[in-house]
Each structure stands twice: as structure tokens, then as C-alpha cells.
Amino acid sequence: MEKNIPQHIAIIMDGNGRWAKKRGLARSFGHMEGAKSLRRALEYFTEIGVKYLTVYAFSTENWSRSQDEVSTLMKLFLKYIKSERKNMMKNKIRFFVSGRKNNIPEKLLNEIEKLKEETKNNDKITLNIAFNYGSRAEIIDAVNDIIKDGKENITEEDFSKYLYNDFPDPDLLIRTSGEMRISNFLLWQIAYSELYITDTLWPDFDEKEIDKAIESYNQRDRRFGGVKNV
């Protein structure tokens, strides 16, 4: 049977710290391995025909972590952007970031905007990185913008236009590390997304694990609130 490949996959990339701890390493090593895992996953998703990949990289709640860890994550993201620029252009990957801009170092913000502009016409796959992102924050920001615009009688379609991007809703949400929660991620957008939870830690999430997730997705009966015809 031919596989039905999700158009949009979202991932809560969890478990970097636990991966490092199991090996007696600092959490920063786990984050570095997590970046390698993202590179590998993006390449495979591109190969199999996924059109949008949204990954949860840094939440609005992550500012409560130690200053050293937050600084490491900022530097790692900056390094990722610089190192992946050539690859994104070569493989026609569109780069996008969803989240608030406040508190992000200016140098990092500039590199984000630069890469977004450089890749805006790439059409193979869109990599959407949720950075300084929280879904409640996104919803509040949307509501405030609607109020500023003086809009009334808002529909779901109208509201969606005020979110951080206009990408289609995720078909499949994957969470690694076995945690059974959404963690303030894409609350509006995942209303009818299929959920897949794996105990595999993010640095170990490879092509075989992706295949398992898609196989599980293919076994689902997506009714979107309706009733299947008999």
C-alpha cells in the first residue's frame, strides 16, 4: 500500500538534556546532538515529500532555565543558521521562524531575517522553527492585533490570518521522549492533528523512527469531527 505522506509535520523536539545526562555529559552536548538530529530529519522529510516541518526549538517558558543554558541555545541557533545557509539554498529549503522577537539577541535576529529573506522563494520544503514561541502568547498577540484593527464578528478563518504564519495546520504532531503533553505548542493549529508520542529521545530520532511515526499516521482514520461513511 502506498504511504500517505503528511503535508505538514510538527515536532516537539524533547529529550536533549536527558540524552546528555544518560551519557554523563553537560546538557549543551545534548542540544548540539539535537541540532544534528534536526539536520538529519529535515533531509529525510524533504526526500519523502513533506512540504512543511515545524519544530519547537525554544519556548517562551524556556527563559526560566539557567542563564548559561539559555545563552548556549541562542549561540547554537546562530551557529545553525550560519552553517545551514548553503544547504538550504542548494536544497530549496525555505526558512521561517515563528515567535516573539523580544529578548532575542540583535545579532541572532538579524541573521534570522537575513536567512528568511534569502530563502523566501525556495519551494521544496518549509522549515518553520518555533523560537521564543508559546501558543498562548501567539493567541494573545493575535487578539491584540484584531482589537487594534477594530475587527468584529471574527471567523476562524479571519483569526488564523493573525497568527504568526499562514501555513496549513499540521497533519501529524510528533513528541519525542515519551512526555504526554502539548507544552503550549500550536494549540490553535493542532485541533485535528494526529498525535504520535515516542519514548525515543530527540537526538536518537532517526529515519527509522520517522518511518514508524508515518506508519502510525497511515493507520489513522482522519474524520475531522465527522462520521465515516459505511
Model-derived features: where do they sit?
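Flexible, compositionally biased loop and terminal segments
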Residues: M1-V230
